[in-house]
Curated annotation (Swiss-Prot):
It catalyses: GTP + H2O = 7,8-dihydroneopterin 3'-triphosphate + formate + H(+). The keyword Hydrolase applies. This is GTP cyclohydrolase 1. GO terms for cellular component: cytoplasm. It is an enzyme of class 3 (hydrolase). Gene3D superfamilies: 1.10.286.10, 3.30.1130.10. Keywords: GTP-binding, Hydrolase, Metal-binding, Nucleotide-binding, One-carbon metabolism, Zinc. Belongs to the GTP cyclohydrolase I family. The gene is folE. The keyword Hydrolase applies. One of its GO terms (molecular function) is GTP binding. InterPro entries: GTP-CH-I_C/QueF, GTP-CH-I_N, GTP_CycHdrlase_I, GTP_CycHdrlase_I_CS, GTP_CycHdrlase_I_dom. Its EC number is 3.5.4.16.
Length: 217
């Protein structure tokens, strides 16, 4: 088992304390064993759907899906994949809002295992620490790469950054298209879902909150 970084342990503990962690069991299974079992069961599913897995187009599909689940679209379930985080002392005494907008994300609806496609905007007010800008994108991606509900994902990103920055002054908003709405059920191809999580000064001070939302337009 890969040892978890201090950042990963801190973030996981903070989410568990707040009841915001993705529902998971404590069962420990190696990556290779996961792939083997997923491939086996995916083969059974596809055969039950009367697909011919001897066809050269489908032959490797169970293997591809297993690899995709473990190494890519659900890799955020494993905190060994939590990004390496660089947080540095705020020697420049920056005290104005830092906002990263248009962060693309692709996640998976945990109810139907179909795509959530969206963009996030994340902001914080620097206090004692600042974070490398690309790390914000990587944190968003980490929490997107697991079965999700958008409301929880928004809160997870907020708490992760609050924990790493040791400051409540963080804001997150996500606009996303849910393919469980677009491609099935109601079949609404144009609707989007917006979720927001605000902390500290963003929640307390209307002017700061307004500045955050104004910058998204």
């Amino acid at each position: 088992m890969t040892a978890l970084s201090e950042s990963a342990l801190m973030v996981r503990a903070a989410l568990e304390e707040r009841g915001l962690e993705t529902p998971m069991t404590s069962k420990v299974v190696s990556r290779e064993e996961k792939k083997e079992k997923i491939e086996y069961h995916m083969r059974e599913i596809l055969e039950l759907l009367s697909l011919d897995l001897t066809d050269d187009s489908l032959m490797e599909t169970p293997h591809r899906i297993a690899k995709m689940y473990v190494d890519e679209v659900f890799s955020g379930l494993d905190y060994a994949n939590f990004p390496k985080i660089t947080v540095i002392e705020n020697k420049m005494k920056c005290d104005e809002m830092v906002r990263v907008k248009g962060i693309t994300l692709t996640s998976t609806c945990e109810h139907h295992l179909v795509t959530i496609d969206g963009k996030a905007t994340v902001a914080y007010i620097p206090r004692g620490k600042i974070i490398g800008l690309s790390k914000i994108n990587r944190i968003v991606r980490f929490f997107a790469q697991r079965p999700q509900v958008q409301e929880r994902m928004t809160q997870q990103i907020l708490v992760a950054l609050q924990t790493l920055l040791e400051s409540d002054d963080v804001a997150v908003t996500i606009d996303a298209t849910h393919y469980c709405v677009k491609a099935r059920g109601v079949m609404d191809a144009t609707s989007e879902t917006t979720t927001t999580a605000l902390g500290g000064i963003f929640k307390r001070i209307p002017a700061t909150r307004a500045e955050f939302f104004h910058g998204i337009r």
